[in-house]
């Protein structure tokens, strides 16, 4: 709509004025082509991104200790294979722009809105996995909701599964479950192996389990100093 086009024009004009970035328009499609330096130079990408978000993930002189938005956002969207889904990145930013900016914040996006964006991206990603691809994942994560803080020892997962009789439940419905765990016959160890192969968890060098934020937040697991899990 006209409002969106006006915002797009403002963004391009700001890029040209502040960063000397000239946008060209494709003659056939009329699409705007991002300047080469904005596509390939990380320093330029960071500067433009921080012109939108501000330079830190917290206010005050020590805000840098919480991280820098340009790296903080993708780092919190990484899966266990060290990959970021473009859909998750766009979902996080789409959610972030919905929040009102505090009067004393001089940038279009506030760091708390970016954190809320990660929560939304996590909700969407987990919903995709549990509803569309691997419904059994929801069943193995439900007993852990609100009861585990990562990184943690593997027994914190397996003991809760034992209390919930998760493995028995999966075995009883194995034939009816779409894409059941491949290593279910190995019990809890096999389930952990499947979660790791899907990129949902990581096994650290010391044997503890870590879960990327893009999954952890929606699955309701805690992490000290991390984005708050959904309730």
For the regions a protein language model found, what residue spans apply to each?
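The catalytic "switch" region of P-loop NTPases
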Residues: 1-64
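C-terminal leucine-rich, beta-strand-based interaction scaffolds used for sensing/assembly
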Residues: 36-231
């Amino acid at each position: 709509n006209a409002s969106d086009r006006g915002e797009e024009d403002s963004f391009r004009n700001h890029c040209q004025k502040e960063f000397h970035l000239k946008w060209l328009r494709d003659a056939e499609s009329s699409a705007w082509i991002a300047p080469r330096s904005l596509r390939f130079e990380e320093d330029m990408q960071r500067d433009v991104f921080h012109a939108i978000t501000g330079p830190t993930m917290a206010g005050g002189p020590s805000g840098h200790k919480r991280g820098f938005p340009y790296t903080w956002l993708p780092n919190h969207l990484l899966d266990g294979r060290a990959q970021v889904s473009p859909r998750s990145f766009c979902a996080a930013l789409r959610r972030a722009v919905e929040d009102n900016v505090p009067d004393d914040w001089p940038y279009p996006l506030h760091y708390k809105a970016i954190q809320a964006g990660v929560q939304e991206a996590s909700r969407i990603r987990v919903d995709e996995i549990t509803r569309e691809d691997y419904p059994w994942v929801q069943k193995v994560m439900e007993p852990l909701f609100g009861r585990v803080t990562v990184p943690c020892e593997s027994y914190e997962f397996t003991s809760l599964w034992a209390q919930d009789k998760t493995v028995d439940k999966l075995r009883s419905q194995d034939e009816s479950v779409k894409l059941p765990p491949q290593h279910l016959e190995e019990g809890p160890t096999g389930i952990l192996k499947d979660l790791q192969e899907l990129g949902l968890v990581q096994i650290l060098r010391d044997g503890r389990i870590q879960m990327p934020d893009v999954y952890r937040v929606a699955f309701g697991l805690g992490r000290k100093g991390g984005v708050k899990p959904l309730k």
